[in-house]
Amino acid sequence: VDSLAQALRPFCVDLVVPTAPSVLQLRNVLHLATEVRGVLHPAGPPLLTLADALHPTAAVGGTPTPDAVSTIGELEAMDRGRYAGPVGWVDAAGDGELGIALRCAQVVDRFARLFAGCGIVAGSDPDSEVAEAAAKLVPIRDALEGVY
């Protein structure tokens, strides 16, 4: 949250950062969520400038970002493809809305490669993190199988 606020601060005339997260309950997982809200400067930056300042967020790239992204590149044995990239729409004026593809699928022909991640920190238990990632993939799998 701190790195997100730090990245947004130069673009905002007002920024509200809650001191504590809330619990976001989804069908099969719980998340800690912090809703950061800001008001952009009147001449506000283009959407893609904001996306560039925010991507990758600490949630997917770690912090400090340059060091963490470098370490992930050295240790992670997979190509993330579009995982954790910005997704959304941008119009001809540069306005739009973007989110982060934290859970996504890349579908080619009859095959789908599913992506989900976990927040790895010093005290993380690898088995618990794998179980969490598996739980996060269930809605994508179910949607692809027509369960919903």
PLM region spans:
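Contiguous alpha-helical scaffold segments within structured protein domains
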Residues: V1-G73, E145-Y148
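Glycine-rich, small/acidic residue-mixed loop/short-helix segments
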Residues: A58-Y148
